[in-house]
Amino acid sequence: MYRSARSLHRFSASLSDLRAAQRSIKARNVCPAPGLRHQTVRMASSEAFRIERDTFGELKVPSDKYYGAQTVRSTMNFRIGGVTERMPIQVIRAFGILKKAAAEVNKDYGLDPKIADAIMKAADEVESGKLDDHFPLVVWQTGSGTQTNMNVNEVISNRAIEMLGGKLGSKDPVHPNDHVNKSQSSNDTFPTAMHIAAAKEVHEVLLPGLQTLHDALAAKAEQFKDIIKIGRTHTQDAVPLSLGQEFGGYVQQVKYSIARVKASLPRVYELAAGGTAVGTGLNTRIGFAEKVADKVSALTGLPFVTAANKFEALAAHDALVELSGALNTVAVSMMKIANDIRFLGSGPRSGLGELILPENEPGSSIMPGKVNPTQCEAMTMVAAQVMGNHVAVTVGGSNGHFELNVFKPMIIKNVLNSARLLGDASVSFTNNCVVGIEANTERINKLMSESLMLVTALNPHIGYDKAAKIAKTAHKDGSTLKEAALKLGFLNEQQFEEWVRPHDMLGPK
């Protein structure tokens, strides 16, 4: 095969050098991140791992992953919670939007178009969800979200390198810091991604869900407008109202919920990008912040603008605390509405029984035929969770020390969780409960006719004291109001029939 002994000698020497290099690499103190076990999908390497470096040294990185050494190091240092505590994917995809916008602006300011275009294409893949499997980090990391920002930078860098025919982990020709993170800091990119993610979740999940619930309750209010029932205050009998009026109260609560959430959004639309490390904008160009905000707005269709004050945008998260407060108020409304509906539907024979709720599934593993108000229970649990989330957001928001709040990942995790839960629960509650609610008119009429509080209609005619005596007498004797009134001689039958008319007791005269 070889033409001379000299050629054979050179081949043997090269083979020896390769084997020596392999032994040297194996001898190094490099190890994969604990818990990272991936099915190897060969990308730019024929080995299961590649060697990457950060300022602390070398680490093994799975060859089928686009992230790099800093991401691996984070998985080693923050083994908290496992996969269920990973950074919300909405934040990762928001980062994709931001990194694309930044690359486009940096291109305008002189970044090599080839590099900028590759970054933008890779960022598109992050935003679309194509690269979701390359983001393993948990929420519980540095409070600025630095590890997640670098996770995004590394993934976009390596994917862009691959697109350009380079070697993964080489940082050439696309560097995660110098190019992907150009004119940026974790301190301004993470809060920017927080706001993008929160605004999108509100618009795409929460507000449509609340509107669906609002419309369904409004339809029921119209359907029930002519059904007169007894009201209740302090859980005791009160004067009548229509079932439609009762549901109308729920409609207004949801209407206000939508308005409160929308009212909080202008502050969420303000983006921290361009503030860099402490809000001064060090290492950015004049106009960078405004241009990035404009690009993000164009990419999302939402009215994002650059934050009026970058120091506030980095050091505080009052905008998200405000949004969380609105979500907390929504949860309060949902708790009241769901509780009312399940109590009005209690029974079927030993409860209030004024509403007939849809039967969706068996309710008991021991009591045959039992059906429970499961959608109401799910909604009230969601409401409780959102209230708890707001406590966490409040604590996190109040701990912005000096120039940087370092509770960012926890804050956005809870805000996104609240928005998603309320949006999803509103749709579930609507489709599986509200639209199928029917009025039990027989039960409603029976309870109303037996109520002593109809006596309130007599106040203008015979006075409070005499009306109260009629009610107490009827209760003591077990008689009707009419029987007690006639027995006491305070009015005649014709007067009672004229004055005590539930349909005339539904509003001012």
UniProtKB/Swiss-Prot annotation:
<keyword id="KW-0963">Cytoplasm</keyword>
<keyword id="KW-0816">Tricarboxylic acid cycle</keyword>
<protein>
    <recommendedName>
        <fullName>Fumarate hydratase, mitochondrial</fullName>
        <ecNumber>4.2.1.2</ecNumber>
    </recommendedName>
</protein>
<dbReference type="InterPro" id="IPR008948">
    <property type="entry name" value="L-Aspartase-like"/>
</dbReference>
<dbReference type="GO" id="GO:0004333">
    <property type="term" value="F:fumarate hydratase activity"/>
</dbReference>
<dbReference type="GO" id="GO:0005634">
    <property type="term" value="C:nucleus"/>
</dbReference>
<feature type="active site" description="Proton donor/acceptor">
    <location>
        <position position="234"/>
    </location>
</feature>
<dbReference type="GO" id="GO:0006281">
    <property type="term" value="P:DNA repair"/>
</dbReference>
<dbReference type="InterPro" id="IPR024083">
    <property type="entry name" value="Fumarase/histidase_N"/>
</dbReference>
<comment type="function">
    <text>Catalyzes the reversible stereospecific interconversion of fumarate to L-malate. Experiments in other species have demonstrated that specific isoforms of this protein act in defined pathways and favor one direction over the other.</text>
</comment>
<dbReference type="Pfam" id="PF10415">
    <property type="entry name" value="FumaraseC_C"/>
</dbReference>
<feature type="site" description="Important for catalytic activity">
    <location>
        <position position="377"/>
    </location>
</feature>
<dbReference type="GO" id="GO:0005739">
    <property type="term" value="C:mitochondrion"/>
</dbReference>
<dbReference type="InterPro" id="IPR020557">
    <property type="entry name" value="Fumarate_lyase_CS"/>
</dbReference>
<dbReference type="GO" id="GO:0005694">
    <property type="term" value="C:chromosome"/>
</dbReference>
<feature type="binding site">
    <location>
        <position position="233"/>
    </location>
    <ligand>
        <name>substrate</name>
    </ligand>
</feature>
<dbReference type="Pfam" id="PF00206">
    <property type="entry name" value="Lyase_1"/>
</dbReference>
<dbReference type="GO" id="GO:0006974">
    <property type="term" value="P:DNA damage response"/>
</dbReference>
<keyword id="KW-0809">Transit peptide</keyword>
<dbReference type="GO" id="GO:0006106">
    <property type="term" value="P:fumarate metabolic process"/>
</dbReference>
<keyword id="KW-0539">Nucleus</keyword>
<dbReference type="InterPro" id="IPR022761">
    <property type="entry name" value="Fumarate_lyase_N"/>
</dbReference>
<dbReference type="GO" id="GO:0000050">
    <property type="term" value="P:urea cycle"/>
</dbReference>
<dbReference type="InterPro" id="IPR018951">
    <property type="entry name" value="Fumarase_C_C"/>
</dbReference>
<feature type="active site">
    <location>
        <position position="364"/>
    </location>
</feature>
<keyword id="KW-0234">DNA repair</keyword>
<feature type="binding site" description="in site B">
    <location>
        <begin position="175"/>
        <end position="178"/>
    </location>
    <ligand>
        <name>substrate</name>
    </ligand>
</feature>
<dbReference type="InterPro" id="IPR005677">
    <property type="entry name" value="Fum_hydII"/>
</dbReference>
<feature type="binding site">
    <location>
        <begin position="370"/>
        <end position="372"/>
    </location>
    <ligand>
        <name>substrate</name>
    </ligand>
</feature>
<comment type="pathway">
    <text>Carbohydrate metabolism; tricarboxylic acid cycle; (S)-malate from fumarate: step 1/1.</text>
</comment>
<dbReference type="GO" id="GO:0006099">
    <property type="term" value="P:tricarboxylic acid cycle"/>
</dbReference>
<comment type="subunit">
    <text>Homotetramer.</text>
</comment>
<keyword id="KW-0227">DNA damage</keyword>
<keyword id="KW-0158">Chromosome</keyword>
<comment type="similarity">
    <text>Belongs to the class-II fumarase/aspartase family. Fumarase subfamily.</text>
</comment>
<keyword id="KW-0496">Mitochondrion</keyword>
<feature type="binding site">
    <location>
        <position position="365"/>
    </location>
    <ligand>
        <name>substrate</name>
    </ligand>
</feature>
<dbReference type="GO" id="GO:0006108">
    <property type="term" value="P:malate metabolic process"/>
</dbReference>
<feature type="binding site">
    <location>
        <begin position="185"/>
        <end position="187"/>
    </location>
    <ligand>
        <name>substrate</name>
    </ligand>
</feature>
<feature type="transit peptide" description="Mitochondrion">
    <location>
        <begin position="1"/>
        <end position="43"/>
    </location>
</feature>
<dbReference type="GO" id="GO:2001034">
    <property type="term" value="P:positive regulation of double-strand break repair via nonhomologous end joining"/>
</dbReference>
<keyword id="KW-0456">Lyase</keyword>
